[in-house]
From Swiss-Prot:
Signal peptide coordinates: none
PANTHER family tied to this protein: MONOACYLGLYCEROL LIPASE, MONOACYLGLYCEROL LIPASE ABHD6
Underlying gene: bphD
Catalytic activity as recorded in UniProt: 2,6-dioxo-6-phenylhexa-3-enoate + H2O = 2-oxopent-4-enoate + benzoate + H(+)
One Pfam family here: Abhydrolase_1
Function: Catalyzes an unusual C-C bond hydrolysis of 2-hydroxy-6-oxo-6-phenylhexa-2,4-dienoic acid (HOPDA) to produce benzoic acid and 2-hydroxy-2,4-pentadienoic acid (HPD).
SUPFAM superfamilies in UniProt: alpha/beta-Hydrolases (SSF53474)
Gene3D superfamilies: alpha/beta hydrolase
Protein name in the entry: 2-hydroxy-6-oxo-6-phenylhexa-2,4-dienoate hydrolase
EC identifiers of the protein: 3.7.1.8
Organism: Metapseudomonas furukawaii
Residues of the active site: 265 (proton acceptor)
Length: 286
């Protein structure tokens, strides 16, 4: 497997797109071939590398150019307050990144908030997307079976409002199914990321007041997505309900759904080997 590090793949680019003027986006890049852009979730301290470090090497070895993008207002990208729903604004930033790097089309891989971003991108810029891979994405609106917001989302907002190591630990315990995977190294790395950019936390809460989670619902437009779509879900996801996967499957024309048992909200990390195999096989298919 290709040996990669965060520091050796770290890059910045300025984007200019609606709502972004000379805005610094941080990303990690490795490999050659068709471009795969991986989009992280929306928890405090999230970033491209921490979300996808178990996936980037196998995708590079499979012959892809992989970009792990830090969304606006996360990790090393510039701070921002958003007046519109975050998935749509983030989708514009993805387009801005692609324009700045001269990328005509890319496959998108999105987890949680990153999945909402990918859905919005597929709707707004269909000519710029190859295939779509989603892991427990936000954006499908109300649930038929689970009260919303779910337990994990409540803990996520609690951590944003009251950042502490204990609140982080509580969120991660709900985040993952297998509690043995929760190490001090994992928690400390995420905690350090949270502390590096306190402005990001404040801005997220302000943005959530301007455009609450209810505005993220793109159900009415899912039928516009023509990209081949691979949806994955953790059976034990306590952040985004499993029935959202069925809603996506029913509404996206060319979609398939895979459910991981004994899996929480982070399928690409908790079941990395199986996820990598399934996702790469999907990309390779005609």
């Amino acid at each position: 497997m290709t040996a990669l590090t965060e520091s050796s793949t770290s890059k910045f680019v300025k984007i200019n797109e609606k709502g972004f003027s000379d805005f610094n986006i941080h990303y990690n890049e490795a490999g050659n071939g068709e471009t795969v852009i991986m989009l992280h979730g929306g928890g405090p301290g999230a970033g491209g590398w921490s979300n996808y470090y178990r996936n980037v090497g196998p995708f590079v070895d499979a012959g892809y150019r992989v970009i792990l993008k830090d969304s606006p207002g996360f990790n090393k990208s510039d701070a921002v307050v958003m007046d519109e729903q975050r998935g749509l604004v983030n989708a514009r930033a993805v387009k801005g990144l692609m324009d700045a790097l001269g990328i005509d089309r890319a496959h998108l891989v999105g987890n949680s908030m990153g999945g909402a971003t990918a859905l919005n991108f597929a709707i707004e810029y269909p000519e710029r997307i190859g295939k779509l891979i989603l892991m427990g994405p936000g954006g499908p609106g109300p649930s038929m079976f689970a009260p919303m917001p779910m337990e994990g989302i409540k803990l996520l907002f609690k951590l944003y409002a009251e950042p502490s190591y204990e609140n982080l630990k509580q969120m991660i315990q709900v985040f993952l199914y297998d509690q043995s995977l929760i190490t001090e190294e994992l928690l400390q790395g995420r905690w350090e990321a949270i502390q590096r950019q306190p402005e990001h936390l404040k801005n997220f809460l302000i943005s959530a007041q301007k455009a609450p989670l209810s505005t993220w619902d793109v159900t009415a437009r899912l039928g516009e997505i023509k990209a081949k779509t691979f949806i994955t879900w953790g059976r034990d996801d306590r952040f985004v309900p499993l029935d959202h996967g069925l809603k996506l499957l029913w509404n996206i024309d060319d979609a398939r759904l895979h459910v991981f048992s004994k899996c929480g909200h982070w399928a690409q990390w908790e079941h990395a080997d199986e996820f990598n195999r399934l996702a790469i096989d999907f990309l390779r298919q005609a």
